[in-house]
C-alpha cells in the first residue's frame, strides 16, 4: 500500500527507493525486464542518504499514455519521462542557482530515436564509455563473488526506472516492452547489444545528474561547516544571510521573490549533518524515508486545463511523435498547478495551511535567531529529517507564529546556528554596523550608549585570535545554564560564565537581571519579555524596538553595576526619545519663604514652625514632580475666574494636611508649582474683582489687597499690577475698553460681566461706535465745566488794579464784557463738540458704508425695493444684531444728509447772526469807553498837543454808504460762485460753515480782550494804553468806528443775511490784499500778543476790510 501511494505521489521519471519488504509485496510485472548484469550494476551503485533523503516534490501531472504495441508507446514514455524530469528539476529549489545543463546524450537518447540526430563522434564516445563500464563491472564480480553474494542478500537499495502510471493495470508487462524494443531495433537495423548499452548509459547519466543537483543545493546554502554536532532540530537549519538592502524586493532576483514554501532554504541539511548521515544504518534510513512519505491524492483544480493523473480517464491516448521543446501557456499553467498541488499535499501532512514566505521573512528569522529572541515554530514541516526529530515530539504546540519573542527553555545554549557565525566576514570591533538594526541613541548627542559593551576586555574574544579555543569553550559550556553568550553582528561571541551579566545587545530589557531570566522557568517572565520587544519592518531592513519602560529598567540596572568613570552631565545626559520628560527642580529657598509668608497672611501661625522644620528636614529629598494638570493642589475656580474665600480656605487646609503627611518616614517632598503660583493668582483675581465691584468699595479692596500681597514673594513685584487702571488680563482690557467713560451706562449688557461669555469683535466695535458720540459729548461737557472753573479762578485771582477814575458806565461795561466772554466760550465749545461729532460721524459712516451688506441695502433703497419706513421698523426690532443696526442706521443717515445739511446751515446762519449782533454791541461799548477816556485825558495834554478834530455827521454817513455798497457787491459775487461750487463738495461746505462760526466768535473776543487790557493797564497813561497820541488819526479812528456801528445797526434790520456777506467780504479781502494793513493798529496788535493767533487774524481781517474802502486815503488821511 505504501508503494502504491508513493507511486501515485511521484511523477514519471522520478527515482524510487525500495526495500526488501516492498519488493516482496510488489507484483512481478511492474518491474522492467532487465538483464542480470544490469541489476548487479544497480546494486553496486548504492544511494547515499544525503542524496536521496529528500525526494523532489512531485512534478505537474502528465497525460496518461495507453500501452500500445507500436513505437509510439516507447516514444511517449520516454518523452513524458524526460519532460517530467525537467519539471522536477525546476521544482527542486527556486532559491538555488540553476544546475548545469545535462549532457546531450541523456537528452536525445531518452527518445529512442535521438541517436539518429547525434553526430557520429558523440555516439561513438557514449558507446565506448558504456562498454568500458560494463567490462569493469564484470571483472569486479568475478574477482569477489562473496561480496556480490552478500550484497544480493542484503539488497540495500534497488533503483529502477518506472514510467509512472495512475493504476497498476495500465503499466505494460515485460513482453510488451520487449516487443517494443525489438520493433525499434527491427526498423533501425540496430543490434540488441547497443540498445541495452544505451539504456544502461541513460540510467547512469540520470543518476549522475540527480547527484549533481543535490550537491549543488546543499553546497550553495551553507558555505562553511559547523564546529560541532547539533543535538537539536533548530541548530541545523541554514539561513541565507542577506544585507539590509538585499531585503528590498527591487534588489532580489526573481526566483527569490517567487511564492515558495518557507522550507525552500530551511529544509536542507548542513554539511556536518550530511557527513553524520552517511554513517547511519541503511535500514533506519529506508524506514525513515518510508515514514516521511506523505499520503497523497490527486487533486484537480477547476481552473486547470489538464486534469491530474489520478482523475483522468485511461481511454484518452495522446500521440505525439516530436519532443516538446517550447512550452505553451497551458503547459505552464499545468506546471504551476502541479506545484500548488504539491504544496497542498505537504500541508495536509501537518494539517496546517502552507504559509507562503519570501526571503525577507527568512532574513528576519536569521536575525532574530542571532538576537536569541526567536521561538521555533513547532510544526512538523519545518523539522529536519533526522532521528533527533522524534526526541522533541512532546513540544509540538502547532503554533505557527513567526516572530515570537521568548526563549526556548529546552535549549541549553543560546546560539542557534554557528555556521552563520563563521560565514560572517571578520569585522573591526565596532558596535552594530548593520543599518537595519538601529541602536538606542540619545537625542542631540552623538555618543553611543556605553551599556552595550562588556565589563572586561577578557570577555570580548576576537575572531582572528582565538577562534578554535573559543569554540571549544562554547562547546564545553553548552550544558550550563549560567553561561551568558552574547552574539554581536560582526560574528563574535562573548562568554561570561558565573559573572555579572551584561546589558542586552539590542536594547532588550532586563526584568530582574540576565541570570534571573536564564534561571527562571516561569511563563510570566517570558510573557513580560515578549511584551517588551517587537519587530518593525522598515524600508532598510528590520528594526527591533524596545519600550521606554524596559529602557528605564536597563538604565537603572546599568547605573547599579557599572564600574566606569562618570562623564560630565552636560556630555551624556539627555532624553533618549521624544517621549521622555525633562524635569526642572529648583526655587528651594523661595518656596520656603513663600509658604511661610502665605501661612502668616492667612492666619496659620501655628503651622508655620512645623512647615519650616519640615522644609529643613526634607530639603534634599526630592521626588519627581507630578503632572501639572493632575495636581491636587490646584484651587477651584468659579465661572468668573474668581477665587472664592471658601476655596482659598480649602486650599490652605489641604496644604496643611499635606505638610502633616510629609512627616511620615520615607516620603519625599515634591515641588509644587501651583503653590508657588498661588499668590500671583490671588493678586490677579483680587484685582479682577476690583474691576467688577462698584466704585465705592474699591478703596477698601485696594487697601486689603496691598496688605495681603506685599510680602508674598520677591517674584511678585515683577508679576504685580502697577495700579487698578492697568489690566492684568486680556479680559480686563476688553472690559475697561468697553466701560471707559461710561461705567454706569445702562445699555451695557450683563453678559459682559462673565468671562466665559465674551462678546465677539464685531459686537465690541459696534458698541464702541454707538457709544462714541455719547463719550465725546460727556467729555466735552466735562472740559467745558473745567474751563469755566479755571476762568473763574483766574478772574478771582486776577490782581485788582487801582480804580483810577472809573465811573458807573465803565463798571457796567466791564461786567457786560465778562458775561459776553463766557457766552462766547460756551458757543465755541459747543461748536467744537459739533465739529468733533461731525468728524467722528463721517469716519463711522464711511467705514460702515464700505461694507457689502450696507451697500446692498443702499442699492435696494435707491431701486425702491425697500422703503425708509421698513428700515425704521427693522431698526425698532429689539432682536436686531448690532451689525445690522449699524448698517440700517448708516443707510438712513446717508439718505438724509441733504436735509441734515440744510438744517445745519440754518442753525449756523442763526448762530452767526447772534454772534455778529453781540460783536456790534461790543464795538459800541468800546466806542463809549474810548470817548470817556479821551475826554478825561484831553485836559491833561492840552499844553502839549492840539485838540483832536471831530468828524462831521456827513463823513460818517458816507462811510456807512460805502460799506453797504461793498456788501451788496460781495453778496452778488457770492451768489454767482455758490452756483458754480454748489455741485461740488457738500461736506467741505459744512466744514467751512463751522470754521466761519469759529472765526466770528473769535473776532469780538479778540477785540474786547485787546481793549480791555488797554483800559485796565492804562489807567490814564497815554503810552501804556498802546495808542500813540497823534491827535487827529486816533480821533478819526474812534469816531469812524462809532459812526460805522450806528449805520450798520440801522442797515442790519433791512438785510437779514448781511452778516454772512460781511464775513465773506472779510475773508476775500484778506486773501486778495493781505499786505494792506493800517499803521494805526500795530500798537493794538502788539499789546494783544497774549491772545490766540486766530483772534489776531480776525482783527486783521476786520481792519483790512476797512482799509479797502474806496477813497479811504483821501477821506481819513
Swiss-Prot record:
<feature type="compositionally biased region" description="Low complexity">
    <location>
        <begin position="679"/>
        <end position="712"/>
    </location>
</feature>
<feature type="region of interest" description="Disordered">
    <location>
        <begin position="984"/>
        <end position="1004"/>
    </location>
</feature>
<feature type="region of interest" description="Disordered">
    <location>
        <begin position="1"/>
        <end position="106"/>
    </location>
</feature>
<keyword id="KW-0539">Nucleus</keyword>
<feature type="region of interest" description="Disordered">
    <location>
        <begin position="596"/>
        <end position="618"/>
    </location>
</feature>
<keyword id="KW-0217">Developmental protein</keyword>
<feature type="modified residue" description="Phosphoserine">
    <location>
        <position position="523"/>
    </location>
</feature>
<keyword id="KW-0597">Phosphoprotein</keyword>
<dbReference type="GO" id="GO:0045182">
    <property type="term" value="F:translation regulator activity"/>
</dbReference>
<feature type="compositionally biased region" description="Polar residues">
    <location>
        <begin position="283"/>
        <end position="294"/>
    </location>
</feature>
<dbReference type="GO" id="GO:0005634">
    <property type="term" value="C:nucleus"/>
</dbReference>
<keyword id="KW-0678">Repressor</keyword>
<dbReference type="GO" id="GO:0071598">
    <property type="term" value="C:neuronal ribonucleoprotein granule"/>
</dbReference>
<dbReference type="GO" id="GO:0003723">
    <property type="term" value="F:RNA binding"/>
</dbReference>
<keyword id="KW-0805">Transcription regulation</keyword>
<feature type="compositionally biased region" description="Pro residues">
    <location>
        <begin position="95"/>
        <end position="104"/>
    </location>
</feature>
<dbReference type="GO" id="GO:0048477">
    <property type="term" value="P:oogenesis"/>
</dbReference>
<feature type="region of interest" description="Disordered">
    <location>
        <begin position="493"/>
        <end position="528"/>
    </location>
</feature>
<comment type="similarity">
    <text>Belongs to the 4E-T/EIF4E-T family.</text>
</comment>
<dbReference type="InterPro" id="IPR018862">
    <property type="entry name" value="eIF4E-T"/>
</dbReference>
<feature type="short sequence motif" description="YXXXXLphi motif 1">
    <location>
        <begin position="327"/>
        <end position="333"/>
    </location>
</feature>
<keyword id="KW-0896">Oogenesis</keyword>
<keyword id="KW-0804">Transcription</keyword>
<dbReference type="GO" id="GO:0031594">
    <property type="term" value="C:neuromuscular junction"/>
</dbReference>
<dbReference type="GO" id="GO:0000932">
    <property type="term" value="C:P-body"/>
</dbReference>
<comment type="subunit">
    <text>Component of the osk RNP complex, which is composed of at least exu, yps, aret/bruno, cup, and the mRNA of osk. Interacts with the decapping activators me31B and tral. Component of the nanos RNP complex, which is composed of at least smg, cup, tral, me31B, the CCR4-NOT complex members Rga/NOT2 and Caf1, and the mRNA of nanos (nos). Interacts with btz. Recruited to the 3'-UTR of nos and osk mRNAs by smg and btz, respectively.</text>
</comment>
<dbReference type="GO" id="GO:0007319">
    <property type="term" value="P:negative regulation of oskar mRNA translation"/>
</dbReference>
<dbReference type="GO" id="GO:0043195">
    <property type="term" value="C:terminal bouton"/>
</dbReference>
<dbReference type="GO" id="GO:0009953">
    <property type="term" value="P:dorsal/ventral pattern formation"/>
</dbReference>
<dbReference type="GO" id="GO:0017148">
    <property type="term" value="P:negative regulation of translation"/>
</dbReference>
<feature type="compositionally biased region" description="Pro residues">
    <location>
        <begin position="54"/>
        <end position="64"/>
    </location>
</feature>
<comment type="function">
    <text>Adapter protein that plays a central role in localization of transcripts in the oocyte and in young embryos. Maintains RNA targets in a repressed state by promoting their deadenylation and protects deadenylated mRNAs from further degradation. Binds to and recruits eIF-4E to the 3'-UTR of some mRNA targets which prevents interaction between eIF4E1 and eIF4G. This may contribute to translational repression but does not appear to be necessary for it to occur. Can promote translational repression independently of deadenylation and eIF4E1 binding.</text>
</comment>
<feature type="modified residue" description="Phosphoserine">
    <location>
        <position position="347"/>
    </location>
</feature>
<feature type="modified residue" description="Phosphoserine">
    <location>
        <position position="520"/>
    </location>
</feature>
<feature type="region of interest" description="Disordered">
    <location>
        <begin position="1016"/>
        <end position="1051"/>
    </location>
</feature>
<feature type="region of interest" description="Disordered">
    <location>
        <begin position="654"/>
        <end position="673"/>
    </location>
</feature>
<dbReference type="GO" id="GO:0003729">
    <property type="term" value="F:mRNA binding"/>
</dbReference>
<dbReference type="GO" id="GO:0007317">
    <property type="term" value="P:regulation of pole plasm oskar mRNA localization"/>
</dbReference>
<dbReference type="GO" id="GO:0005829">
    <property type="term" value="C:cytosol"/>
</dbReference>
<feature type="modified residue" description="Phosphoserine">
    <location>
        <position position="524"/>
    </location>
</feature>
<feature type="modified residue" description="Phosphoserine">
    <location>
        <position position="513"/>
    </location>
</feature>
<feature type="modified residue" description="Phosphoserine">
    <location>
        <position position="350"/>
    </location>
</feature>
Amino acid at each position: 500500500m505504501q508503494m502504491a501511494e508513493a507511486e501515485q505521489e511521484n511523477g514519471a521519471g522520478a527515482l524510487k527507493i525500495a526495500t526488501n519488504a516492498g519488493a516482496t509485496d510488489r507484483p512481478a510485472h511492474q518491474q522492467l525486464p532487465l538483464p542480470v548484469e544490469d541489476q548487479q550494476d544497480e546494486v553496486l551503485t548504492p544511494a547515499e542518504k544525503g542524496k536521496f533523503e529528500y525526494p523532489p516534490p512531485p512534478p505537474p501531472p502528465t497525460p496518461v499514455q495507453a500501452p500500445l504495441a507500436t513505437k509510439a508507446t516507447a516514444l511517449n514514455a520516454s518523452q513524458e519521462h524526460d519532460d517530467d524530469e525537467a519539471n522536477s528539476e525546476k521544482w527542486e529549489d527556486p532559491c538555488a542557482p540553476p544546475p548545469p545543463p545535462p549532457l546531450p546524450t541523456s537528452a536525445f537518447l531518452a527518445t529512442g530515436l535521438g541517436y539518429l540526430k547525434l553526430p557520429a563522434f558523440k555516439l561513438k564516445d557514449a558507446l565506448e564509455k558504456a562498454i568500458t563500464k560494463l567490462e569493469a563491472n564484470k571483472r569486479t564480480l568475478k574477482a569477489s563473488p562473496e561480496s556480490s553474494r552478500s550484497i544480493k542478500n542484503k539488497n540495500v537499495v534497488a533503483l529502477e526506472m518506472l514510467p509512472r502510471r495512475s493504476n497498476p493495470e495500465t503499466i505494460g508487462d515485460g513482453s510488451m516492452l520487449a516487443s517494443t524494443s525489438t520493433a525499434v531495433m527491427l526498423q533501425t537495423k540496430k543490434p540488441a547489444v547497443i540498445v541495452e548499452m544505451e539504456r544502461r548509459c541513460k540510467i547512469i547519466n540520470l543518476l549522475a545528474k540527480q547527484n549533481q543537483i543535490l550537491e549543488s543545493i546543499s553546497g550553495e546554502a551553507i558555505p562553511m561547516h559547523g564546529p560541532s554536532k547539533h543535538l537539536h532540530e533548530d541548530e541545523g537549519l541554514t539561513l541565507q544571510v542577506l544585507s539590509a538592502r538585499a531585503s528590498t524586493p527591487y534588489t532580489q532576483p526573481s526566483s527569490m521573490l517567487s511564492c515558495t514554501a518557507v522550507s525552500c532554504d530551511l529544509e536542507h541539511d548542513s554539511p556536518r549533518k550530511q557527513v553524520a548521515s552517511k554513517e547511519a544504518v541503511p535500514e533506519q534510513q529506508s524506514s525513515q524515508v518510508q515514514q516521511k512519505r506523505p499520503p497523497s491524492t490527486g487533486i484537480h483544480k477547476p481552473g486547470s486545463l489538464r486534469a491530474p493523473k489520478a482523475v483522468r480517464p485511461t481511454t484518452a491516448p495522446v500521440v505525439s511523435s516530436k519532443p516538446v521543446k517550447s512550452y505553451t501557456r497551458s503547459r505552464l499553467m499545468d506546471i504551476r498547478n502541479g506545484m500548488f498541488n504539491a504544496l497542498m499535499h505537504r500541508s495536509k501532512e501537518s494539517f496546517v495551511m502552507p504559509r507562503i514566505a519570501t526571503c525577507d521573512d527568512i532574513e528576519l528569522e536569521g536575525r532574530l535567531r542571532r538576537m536569541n529572541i526567536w521561538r521555533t515554530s513547532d510544526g512538523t514541516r519545518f523539522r529536519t529529517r533526522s532521528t533527533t526529530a522524534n526526541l522533541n515530539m512532546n513540544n509540538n504546540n502547532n503554533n505557527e507564529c513567526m516572530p515570537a519573542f521568548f526563549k526556548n527553555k529546552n535549549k541549553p545554549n543560546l546560539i542557534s546556528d554557528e555556521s552563520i557565525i563563521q560565514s560572517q566576514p571578520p569585522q573591526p570591533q565596532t558596535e552594530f554596523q548593520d543599518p537595519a538594526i538601529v541602536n538606542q541613541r540619545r537625542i542631540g548627542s552623538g555618543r553611543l550608549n556605553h551599556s552595550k559593551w562588556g565589563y572586561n576586555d577578557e570577555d570580548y574574544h576576537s575572531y582572528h585570535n582565538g577562534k578554535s579555543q573559543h569554540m571549544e569553550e562554547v562547546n564545553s559550556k553548552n550544558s550550563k545554564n549560567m553561561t551568558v553568550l552574547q552574539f554581536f553582528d560582526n560574528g563574535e561571541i562573548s562568554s561570561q560564565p558565573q559573572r555579572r551579566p551584561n546589558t542586552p545587545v539590542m536594547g532588550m530589557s532586563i526584568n530582574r537581571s540576565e541570570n534571573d531570566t536564564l534561571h527562571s522557568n516561569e511563563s510570566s517572565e517570558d510573557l513580560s519579555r515578549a511584551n517588551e520587544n517587537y519587530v518593525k519592518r522598515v524600508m532598510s531592513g528590520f528594526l527591533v524596538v524596545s519600550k521606554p519602560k524596559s529602557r528605564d529598567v536597563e538604565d537603572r540596572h546599568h547605573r547599579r553595576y557599572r564600574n566606569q568613570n562618570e562623564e560630565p552631565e552636560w556630555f551624556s545626559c539627555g532624553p533618549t526619545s521624544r517621549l521622555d520628560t525633562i524635569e526642572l527642580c529648583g526655587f528651594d529657598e523661595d518656596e520656603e519663604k513663600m509658604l511661610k509668608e502665605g501661612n502668616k497672611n492667612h492666619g496659620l501661625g501655628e503651622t508655620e514652625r512645623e512647615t519650616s522644620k519640615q522644609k529643613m528636614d526634607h530639603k534634599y529629598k526630592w521626588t519627581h514632580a507630578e503632572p501639572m494638570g493632575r495636581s491636587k493642589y490646584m484651587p477651584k475656580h468659579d465661572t468668573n475666574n474668581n477665587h472664592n474665600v471658601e476655596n482659598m480656605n480649602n486650599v490652605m487646609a489641604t496644604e496643611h494636611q499635606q505638610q502633616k503627611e510629609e512627616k511620615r518616614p520615607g516620603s519625599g517632598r515634591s515641588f509644587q508649582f501651583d503653590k508657588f503660583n498661588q499668590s500671583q493668582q490671588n493678586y490677579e483675581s483680587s484685582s479682577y474683582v476690583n474691576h467688577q465691584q462698584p466704585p465705592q468699595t474699591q478703596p477698601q479692596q485696594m487697601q486689603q489687597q496691598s496688605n495681603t500681597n506685599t510680602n508674598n514673594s520677591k517674584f511678585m513685584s515683577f508679576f504685580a499690577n502697577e495700579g487698578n487702571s492697568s489690566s492684568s488680563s486680556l479680559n480686563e482690557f476688553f472690559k475697561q475698553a468697553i466701560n471707559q467713560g461710561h461705567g454706569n451706562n445702562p445699555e451695557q449688557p450683563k453678559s459682559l460681566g462673565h468671562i466665559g461669555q465674551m462678546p465677539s469683535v464685531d459686537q465690541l466695535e459696534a458698541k464702541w461706535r454707538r457709544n462714541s458720540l455719547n463719550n465725546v459729548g460727556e467729555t466735552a461737557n466735562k472740559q467745558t465745566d473745567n474751563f469755566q472753573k479755571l476762568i473763574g479762578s483766574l478772574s478771582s485771582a486776577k490782581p485788582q488794579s487801582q480804580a483810577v477814575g472809573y465811573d458807573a458806565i465803565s463798571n457796567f461795561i466791564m461786567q457786560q464784557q465778562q458775561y459776553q466772554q463766557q457766552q462766547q466760550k460756551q458757543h465755541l465749545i459747543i461748536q467744537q463738540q459739533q465739529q468733533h461729532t461731525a468728524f467722528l460721524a463721517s469716519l463711522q459712516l464711511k467705514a460702515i458704508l464700505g461694507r457689502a451688506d450696507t451697500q446692498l441695502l443702499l442699492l435696494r433703497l435707491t431701486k425702491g425695493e425697500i422703503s425708509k419706513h421698513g428700515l425704521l421698523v427693522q431698526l425698532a426690532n429689539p432682536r436686531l444684531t448690532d451689525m445690522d443696526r449699524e448698517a440700517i442706521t448708516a443707510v438712513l443717515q446717508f439718505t438724509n444728509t441733504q436735509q441734515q445739511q440744510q438744517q445745519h446751515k440754518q442753525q449756523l446762519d442763526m448762530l452767526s447772526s447772534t454772534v455778529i449782533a453781540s460783536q456790534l454791541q461790543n464795538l459800541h461799548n468800546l466806542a463809549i469807553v474810548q470817548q470817556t477816556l479821551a475826554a478825561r485825558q484831553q485836559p491833561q495834554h492840552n499844553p502839549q498837543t492840539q485838540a483832536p478834530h471831530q468828524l462831521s455827521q456827513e463823513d460818517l454817513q458816507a462811510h456807512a454808504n460805502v460799506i453797504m455798497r461793498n456788501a451788496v457787491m460781495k453778496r452778488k459775487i457770492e451768489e454767482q460762485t455758490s452756483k458754480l461750487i454748489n455741485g461740488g463738495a457738500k461736506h467741505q461746505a459744512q466744514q467751512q460753515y463751522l470754521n466761519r462760526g469759529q472765526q466770528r466768535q473769535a473776532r469780538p473776543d479778540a477785540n474786547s480782550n485787546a481793549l480791555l487790557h488797554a483800559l485796565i493797564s492804562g489807567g490814564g497813561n497815554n503810552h501804556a494804553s498802546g495808542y500813540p497820541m497823534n491827535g487827529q488819526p486816533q480821533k478819526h479812528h474812534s469816531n469812524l468806528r462809532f459812526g460805522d456801528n450806528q449805520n450798520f445797526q440801522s442797515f442790519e434790520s433791512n438785510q437779514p443775511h448781511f452778516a454772512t456777506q460781511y464775513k465773506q467780504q472779510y475773508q476775500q479781502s484778506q486773501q486778495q490784499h493781505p499786505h494792506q494793513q493800517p499803521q494805526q493798529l500795530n500798537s493794538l496788535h502788539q499789546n494783544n500778543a497774549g491772545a490766540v493767533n486766530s483772534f489776531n487774524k480776525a482783527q486783521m481781517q476786520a481792519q483790512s476790510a476797512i482799509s479797502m474802502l474806496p477813497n479811504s486815503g483821501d477821506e481819513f488821511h
